[in-house]
Every structure is written in structure tokens, then in C-alpha cells.
Regions:
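Membrane-proximal helix-turn-helix segments that form the acceptor-binding/catalytic region
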Residues: 129, 151, 155-159, 185-205
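N-terminal subdomain of nucleotide-sugar transferases
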Residues: 1-84, 224
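Helix-loop-beta element that forms the nucleotide-linked donor phosphate-binding surface
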Residues: 213-227
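Active-site proximal beta-strand in glycosyltransferases
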Residues: 155-175
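Short N-terminal targeting/anchoring amphipathic segment
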Residues: 127-149, 163-165
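Conserved nucleotide-sugar donor-binding subdomain of glycosyltransferases
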Residues: 77-138
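Histidine-centered beta-alpha loop that forms part of the nucleotide-sugar donor binding/catalytic region
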Residues: 10-11, 144, 167-172, 227
């Protein structure tokens, strides 16, 4: 029997999205041993997970505006879509515009999103109950430039004293550029600090190329592998 894995990435599994690579990792895994936390406002598809937990920007915004206390939705396998594709859940036009703006991944947008994704908003009693019921034994973290996904990975790893395996496909950590923009400098500072926490201690990584592998392994002193 395989260890219980918790995948943390922004998009849920889909054959038509970049997340389809997850099937290569977990195709033969027992479905009750794989769960995922994701943030996109998509209806998840049936795939490698028996259950998923969704936290969206719009739910956090409504809580931040005191319009709703409900943050986080649990999807069991029979509630997921039978057909592949990224079906967007209904949101108002303002929220929809916010998602389009957020897709640009500008430093100022990620900083503002980081304010929205404060722990007191996403770390709800419902989320903790779901985590404790699942009891993950390992985190698979899809490396990205989102500050909030790093924070969630670190929180869960500490709560259960479990390792993090980072899935890394680029050398974004090393791609500093000259800038006088306070937003860019602050974002890079926060991103690099969180990345250093993720890749320190009880962590390993998988890479898409030997070049990327050597860069991270040598810099962080980890023993990741190319897949």
C-alpha cells in the first residue's frame, strides 16, 4: 500500500491541463491514498484523487468582506465531473475579472493575493477537520510563484511532521532581475524566503531536466531526482 499523499497545487487534475502530469506519478496509486488541495474556481474532474479540498480567491474575498463565513469545499469522487475539461464555477463579473487579472502573476497582484490568503482566512475549522480525517503522510507540492501555496505546504508539513516533495519544472528561484520596483523586490524577498523554508529540512524534489536538478540540488543541498 502506498503512503497517503496530499498534493498542493493551484489547479485540479485534468487531462487537458498541465496538471495531467500528476497522472504519470499517481496512475497506479490507490485513490484513497491521494488527496489534493487546489485554488482554481474549477469543478474538478475524476482522476487520481478520491477527495479534494478547494479554497478559491472568491470565497476568501467574500469572507474578507464579511459577506460569508464559508471558505473551502470538499469534493468526494462521486461529486467530481465525469467529463474532462476545465468547467469554471459561476462567479460574478467582478470576481471573474479578478481571476483574469491574477493570471498575469504580476508581483503586485501576488502581494495583494498574499494579503487575501492570510492564514486566519483559509485555515478554518473545516479545513483542519478534513486534514485530520485524511492524515497525510507526505506532501507533493507543485512548485510555483504563488506565496499562499508555499504557506499551506509548510503549515501542513509542520502539523503532521511529514516531508515535502517539490515538483520543480523551472529555475524561477534563480531568475532575479534588476528592478527598482518596491513591489517586485518585496515579492522576490517573500518568495525566496518561503522557497528556502520549503526546500530545507525534510524535503526532496523531482525535476523535469538534469540542468534544473543540478541547480537546485547543489544550491539547497537536497537529493532530488529527474523524472
Amino acid at each position: 500500500m502506498h503512503p497517503k499523499v496530499l498534493i498542493i497545487m493551484t489547479t485540479p487534475y485534468s487531462k487537458s491541463d498541465s496538471s495531467r502530469t500528476l497522472d504519470a506519478y499517481f496512475h497506479f496509486w490507490e485513490k484513497d491514498r491521494v488527496a489534493q488541495v487546489f485554488s482554481r474556481n474549477w469543478l474538478p474532474n475524476k482522476g487520481h484523487c478520491e477527495q479534494m479540498y478547494q479554497i478559491t480567491d472568491s470565497a476568501l474575498l467574500r469572507k474578507w468582506l464579511h459577506q460569508s463565513d464559508s471558505v473551502g469545499k470538499i469534493y468526494h469522487y462521486d461529486e467530481m465531473s465525469d467529463t474532462d475539461g476545465n468547467k469554471v464555477l459561476s462567479d460574478n463579473s467582478t470576481v471573474g475579472f479578478g481571476y483574469k487579472l491574477g493570471a498575469k502573476h504580476l508581483p503586485i497582484i501576488e502581494i495583494l493575493r498574499g494579503m487575501l490568503w492570510r492564514k486566519k482566512y483559509w485555515c478554518t475549522e473545516n479545513f483542519l477537520k478534513w486534514l485530520d480525517g485524511y492524515k497525510p503522510e507526505c506532501i507533493v507540492y507543485n512548485f510555483s510563484n504563488h506565496l499562499f501555496t508555499q504557506q499551506i505546504a509548510l503549515f501542513v508539513a509542520k502539523r503532521f511532521n511529514i516531508p515535502i516533495v517539490a515538483v520543480i519544472g523551472d529555475d524561477y528561484y534563480f531568475n532575479d532581475r534588476f528592478s527598482l520596483s518596491p513591489a517586485y523586490l518585496y515579492f522576490r524577498y517573500k518568495f525566496k524566503k518561503l522557497t528556502e523554508q520549503v526546500l530545507s529540512g525534510n524535503c526532496s524534489a523531482v525535476y523535469c531536466s538534469d540542468k534544473i536538478r543540478d541547480k537546485y540540488n547543489n544550491f539547497f543541498g537536497i537529493n532530488g531526482k529527474t523524472v
